[in-house]
Amino acid sequence: IDKELRKKPQERADAIFLVIDTDTLIKNKAQYAIYQEAKEKYKKQGVIFIESHPCIEIWFLYHLLNKFARTNFETYEALRPAIESVLPKYEKTARYYQKNSAFRDSILKNQANREKAIDFSIKACKYEPIEDEITNYTEVFKAIHFFRLLQKFAEIRLLLAEKLRSNVAIQPSIDSHKTLSVMQNENIICTLKYTGTKLKCIFTDGQTFDIDDTKPLDMTNSII
């Protein structure tokens, strides 16, 4: 992270994500305190943390549950039987993720399952545990929403250029994984904003339009 942040802004990656399983961190209070301190430092520099507790497998599990339910797995080993019940012979390896057909078809390529996992993840993150309660969550949806905001901006710019028959000088200004403002000459034209799973386009005059973030925009869309 430090190496990337030391680069000049024009040479730096568009976004820096840190994807982390927190099960081993939380076990050690001293280690977790150091992590929290570093997290606050890097968040101020624009790094987006993608935490999962206990581990990334809770994200995979959300793809395959029939309905949302809060769970309290403390470690990967505790969660493992649940993930193996829906993904037999599951392995926490790059080879498995790349080669296993069941994983590919139900996790990587299944749009309906992905939208369900996003919904369940947001519900899990909204829950506030009581003191010392173990609760599971994943923030992988933040990365998906971030890239979907960028995709929608790219579509807006392309469609405007096509409609006006000239290049359009607009720029994105990203506040977080939830919000992207479409800018022209430092003025906001409109803002793309997530509220839960819903994406809206809000214009400065107050007009608001719903956007389906799973489908490309086209010329028939009201915001164009």
Predicted regions, residues:
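Generic short N-terminal amphipathic or hydrophobic helices
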Residues: E155, A169, S173, N187-I188, ...
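Amphipathic, interaction-prone secondary-structure segments
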Residues: R165-K198
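Low-complexity, intrinsically disordered short peptide segments enriched in small/polar/basic residues
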Residues: E115, Y137, F153, R165-N167, ...
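Intrinsically disordered, low-complexity regulatory segments enriched in Ser/Thr/Pro
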Residues: I188-D218
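Mixed-charge, Lys/Arg-enriched low-complexity segments
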Residues: F153-L164, G206-I224
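C-terminal accessory helical subdomains adjacent to catalytic cores in phosphodiester-
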Residues: D2-F17, T22-A161, I174
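Generic detector of low-complexity/intrinsically disordered segments
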Residues: P81, K89, N110, A161-E162, ...
